Amino acid sequence: MSSQKCASHLEIARLESLNFKISQLIYFVLIITTLFFTFFALKVIQKKCIFQLSTKILLYQNLFSANIHQIFLGITIVERLNIAFFKLNDKCIPLRPETNCQLYLEMFIAGLSGMVYGQTGLLFERACATFIKKYEKRKSLATGIITSIIVLLLSGSTARIIIWDDPLSEYQLACTSWPSKSRDRSTMFFSICTFISLFNLVISLLIRRHNEKLEYSTPFVVGPRFRKREVIDSTSTICFLTFFQFIFMFIYSFGVFLLGTIREIIGYEQYYFWVVWVYTIPFIAASFPILLIYRIRYSNTNRIMIIKQFTSTKQTQEDHIKQMKNVWN
């Protein structure tokens, strides 16, 4: 017990602040939201999904990563709120040795990076579906499994790469905090994540545009046109998800950079007052299953409306061709 290190008065002041408690409660609501909507997202992907098998595998991986991040964050939040509400009057609030937090941090960052790398994996899969001829079930399955394994390996090793030469000799209030001697690298990591998110957004737009251009090169036969529309719809969904991820990652990366730049000017209290609100990763994780459900249902509803239009309207052959062309635009 003699080697135990206690929280400083600044850390205690941060824990007892109303701003901190509100932010943690909001994060906790986002965590519950993620878990709740993930259950429905899995059902929607399985039963009402236009995605190919490889896309489904990678969507499962993205949902898994989002929930890993939220679960480990949730454990930390419960511990923090327990201290904030019930233990602030204790003589010593013990800090955790960074060596004891290594595995916890690696899992936490694996979930975070898995969401970012997973989007890149989805775009790689969409590129395969676009450019590989005869992208049948076997190729789709192999692409999905191999890509998801690569994403999981990369995300699982990210934290270890960042802290590889850190002696882990300090103490932290929570295991989700970066080791003190690796914080510069962690800032660089989030900047890279923002760049990757921007890259994903640009590539998704290019793939979507390419598919739309090639749509009319497909013979006007229901089967091939329907499959091409599936590729366009699924790519549009990935583009939609990537856009929101980029917005949230940019807010976090730029916010942390800006606050870090002016930290000495605004002081410790103001820095931590604002930094909890620019941590947007829980919003990324919570929005993913919600937006995914929305896009899948939107696509299915749109298709049903098109089919009803075709079956309820009497047309000449020329009118039918014109309407079909408008639908595929």
UniProtKB/Swiss-Prot annotation:
Pfam families: 7TM_GPCR_Sra
Topology in membrane: Multi-pass membrane protein
Protein keywords: Membrane, Transmembrane, Transmembrane helix
Any one cellular-component term (Gene Ontology): membrane
Keyword Phosphoprotein: no
GO-annotated molecular function: G protein-coupled receptor activity; olfactory receptor activity
The UniProt record lists the keyword Signal: no
A single GO BP: detection of chemical stimulus involved in sensory perception
Transmembrane segments: 25-45, 57-77, 104-124, 144-164, 187-207, 238-258, 273-293
Compartment(s) where it occurs, according to its Swiss-Prot or TrEMBL record: Membrane
InterPro entries: 7TM_GPCR_serpentine_rcpt_Sra, Nematode_rcpt-like_serp_alpha
Main location group: membrane
Protein family membership: Belongs to the nematode receptor-like protein sra family.
Protein name: Serpentine receptor class alpha-3
Organism: Caenorhabditis elegans
Lineage of the species this protein comes from: Eukaryota, Metazoa, Ecdysozoa, Nematoda, Chromadorea
